[in-house]
């Protein structure tokens, strides 16, 4: 009983309309903390239901791997979908709002585009690992990450509800009007139609990825073709309206 009380006190959830702030005990062993997080979210399951939220962490330094373990534990034991990680701060709720609205806008845009074609959109849930290739005769949505060495080829748009760290080719039949959306945009190579953009670390790219601004932290971004270049930009309603 004492252990259960301590575990319940080791995790505090503060929520707003767009996300959750997870306040964690600084000293509890990480394995026990994971269990406490799971119990806390199970107890709150009726409140969150099928929510799609941003998340932030406070009270304890977490490595990237530990953050991902916590997110995986939440998603595996609830119907919550974590869209992105937001650093804590005074503008936290505003950033969460921006990310969640960007997600909703991108999904809506994808649905509108799919409604105009006869070939159904393809969905894939899970992480694409090195060597895996997905091809689609229409648009494709990945609910997970695309790791280095993985590749997606689609005749339509590509939406990645996770991190893009591999290769993607949208509009593979030559359509430059297609786009690539990712919650965390770190591609090795993006191709839209006949245009190719590689990471600046890659030697002698045909077209460098041009960023109008460098994000201060992970945020949803979209890659579009314009004037013979591929641009990666923070996603906004104006951007979505232009594609």
Curated annotation (Swiss-Prot):
TM regions (residue ranges): none
The entry's keywords: Cell cycle, Cell division, Septation
Domain of life: Bacteria
Gene3D superfamilies per record: 2.160.20.70, 3.30.160.540
Record GO biological process: cell morphogenesis; division septum assembly; regulation of cell septum assembly
Its biological purpose: Cell division inhibitor that blocks the formation of polar Z ring septums. Rapidly oscillates between the poles of the cell to destabilize FtsZ filaments that have formed before they mature into polar Z rings. Prevents FtsZ polymerization.
Subunit architecture: Interacts with MinD and FtsZ.
Family the entry assigns: Belongs to the MinC family.
NCBIfam families associated with the record: minC (TIGR01222)
Protein name: Probable septum site-determining protein MinC
Organism: Agathobacter rectalis (strain ATCC 33656 / DSM 3377 / JCM 17463 / KCTC 5835 / VPI 0990)
């Amino acid at each position: 009983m004492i252990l259960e009380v301590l575990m319940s006190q080791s995790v505090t959830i503060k929520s707003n309309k767009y996300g959750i702030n997870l306040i964690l005990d600084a000293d509890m062993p990480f394995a026990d903390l994971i269990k406490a997080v799971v119990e806390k979210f199970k107890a709150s399951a009726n409140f969150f239901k099928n929510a799609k939220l941003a998340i932030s962490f406070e009270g304890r330094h977490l490595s990237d791997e530990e953050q991902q373990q916590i997110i995986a534990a939440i998603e595996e034991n609830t119907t919550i979908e974590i869209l992105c990680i937001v650093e804590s701060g005074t503008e936290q709720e505003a950033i969460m709002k921006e990310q969640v609205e960007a997600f909703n806008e991108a999904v809506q845009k994808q649905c509108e585009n799919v409604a105009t074609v006869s070939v159904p959109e393809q969905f894939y849930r899970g992480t694409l690992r090195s060597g895996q290739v997905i091809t689609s005769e229409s648009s494709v949505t990945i609910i997970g990450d695309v790791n280095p060495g993985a590749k997606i080829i689609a005749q339509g748009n590509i939406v990645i509800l996770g991190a893009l760290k591999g290769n993607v080719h949208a509009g593979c039949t030559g359509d430059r009007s297609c786009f690539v959306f990712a919650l965390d945009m770190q591609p090795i190579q993006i191709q839209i139609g006949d245009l190719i953009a590689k990471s600046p670390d890659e030697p002698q790219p045909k077209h460098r990825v041009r960023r109008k601004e460098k994000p201060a932290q992970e945020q949803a971004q979209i890659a579009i073709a314009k004037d013979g270049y591929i641009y990666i930009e923070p996603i906004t309603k104006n951007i979505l309206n232009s594609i």
